[in-house]
């Protein structure tokens, strides 16, 4: 069985360097890490991470707290889980999924939280003693990862404006949260840029609700229309409403969504959407948390990912 000394000899480095690569990878260069990991792989050397955790007084467990109700019809959180677990696995950490009622079961070294609303910061989150990273923009000073929601909706609105003269309506989610306000602001900025009057509605994040509202609006519209929606789910309801009235998509009614993780690909016609790189964002959450844990809880700030406008048949 290979030893740490064997790895050091194979990589032509000191035992101290091998130990640093294993126990404190953030303190060594990528070149050194690659060299040592290559030697470990060649010698089939497996570090004792349980012993390391014991010495460092760590559990090697990170909790993912989801405070939002998960919809089994779309894999948004599965994509997030994939990204988080992928990065944690690279660093030999286990991921424990917890809810509001199971949060305090078992120990952990840090927490990633998502689906938070304003009252959660004063209640659940304020009681945390472990390093925390939030998936989703917040205004409470907590480190977070998110997509540039304002830019995404701005791009979608500008896109439908390029389809010709038509009334551009925004269907937002009825939540007074940073991500929703940012999406609304993107629409408003695009409308103002073209000196157009905003026409905004806030509804539940439900395709049934959006279908009912869109049907009533479309009945009263004489001109071509475009609906910029704050979620793919809302956009699907708009498409159904237009089709039920015999409207052509996109000739009569153009529709865009937001999220781009599943529903956009099963709609007919396929939905133009603002894609969030959720897997990559999940990886970034884990990276930020691990760095925070290694820096004794030091603040990490925020990171915004760039959205991507995926143009499909609902606006083509």
Curated annotation (Swiss-Prot):
Keywords: DNA-binding, Repressor, Transcription, Transcription regulation. GO terms for molecular function: DNA-binding transcription factor activity; transcription cis-regulatory region binding. InterPro entries: HTH_LacI, LacI/GalR-like_sensor, Lambda_DNA-bd_dom_sf, Peripla_BP_I. It holds the Pfam family LacI. Residues 1-56 form the HTH lacI-type domain. Residues 4-23 bind DNA. One of its GO terms (biological process) is regulation of DNA-templated transcription. The keyword Transcription applies. This is Uncharacterized HTH-type transcriptional regulator YvdE. The lineage of its organism: Bacteria, Bacillati, Bacillota, Bacilli, Bacillales. The gene is yvdE.
